[in-house]
Amino acid sequence: AAGRVLMTVEAEAEIDFNSETVVTTENIYTLDMLGVENAYEKLREEKKSDDIKFYCVGYSVKHYYQNGYVITNLEGHKCNKISCELIATFLPDEVVDGLYAAVERAGLYVANLTLEPIAAINVAIPERFRLLNIALVDVGAGTSDISITKDGSIVAYGMIPSAGDEITECLAKHYLTDFNEADALKCKSTEMDEVEFSDIMGLPYKVSSEEIAEVVKDTVYSITKSVADKIIELNGGKSVSAVFVVGGGGKIKGFVESLAEFLELPKERVALRGSEVMGNITFMQDDIKVDSLLVTPVGICLNFYEQRNNFIFVNINDERIKLYD
């Protein structure tokens, strides 16, 4: 649900020093926060309201500048001025409150808040690949999240409200099953040649994965067409050089091939990413299957150690106040 109301804003920020100064980590963090603040003000201007209540749930720096020249890492360099260009993403206050409330009702607490495309791209597309014009598509249940890299940085985020649940609904209607049975059917079809199930009348069926792929073909075409159109829009009106697909929805047969067709790319330039990008991740369970389903969860875990995008709660006069950390 969060992705459907996500707002993305590009902004700039700069810091002028009184004299030549060695840039510290604190200077860089201050610069980033100035950029986020400028993005927030820009969002308020676009919404034409001073009462806007949006929270920044993540940001990515596109470029840092030292005295006006692009630089990868500012820390330790001497200069008179530092600046940055970044992309900040915001969610409405009520959406963030809803996410926290749902977690708290389960008896848990939120340790970190991030966006799925930010988490996934940090695993699936390492910085050494970001000079290339690549798209990452995280095909989840309700949304397909998209991010674009070019010239060494992440240059755009986007989403479409179409993903794996539409495929599940298609199967449920065709085979007359409930949603959970259809979802299990969808998942099994990506790993087995034949799948057994029962419809709501109790009648047993055994169907091939090829038949299932044929049933959902039109739905897959519709989703991949929307994804391709969004990628082209985010990339300035042209296709990218390659696409990495993660998430469960992208595992359905025909998905990556259809996406390649709509983007006019060779089939080998659109591929699922799984174990190939998690070679340096050690899992405690020996029998865990390392595939595209794990890319985003692993990215979320890594983000917890690397970022500070979360909220803290304090009680003042018996009233709980939420603060952005």
Model-found features: residue ranges?
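Short, solvent-exposed amphipathic alpha-helical segments in soluble enzyme
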Residues: 129, 258-265
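Gly/Thr-rich phosphate-binding beta-strand-loop-beta motif of the actin/hexokinase/Hsp70
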Residues: 1-2, 127-156, 171
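Phosphate-binding glycine-rich/basic clefts of nucleotide- and phosphate-handling proteins
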Residues: 57, 88, 93-97, 101, ...
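Nucleotide/phosphate-binding catalytic cleft detector across ATP-hydrolyzing
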Residues: 2-134, 191-198, 206-213, 234, ...
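Acidic-glycine-rich active-site phosphate/pyrophosphate-binding loop
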Residues: 140-142, 262-280
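Glycine-rich phosphate-binding/hydrolytic loop that grips phosphoryl groups
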Residues: 271-324
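Glycine-rich beta-strand-to-loop/alpha-helix junction loops that act as flexible
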Residues: 1-4, 242-250, 273-275
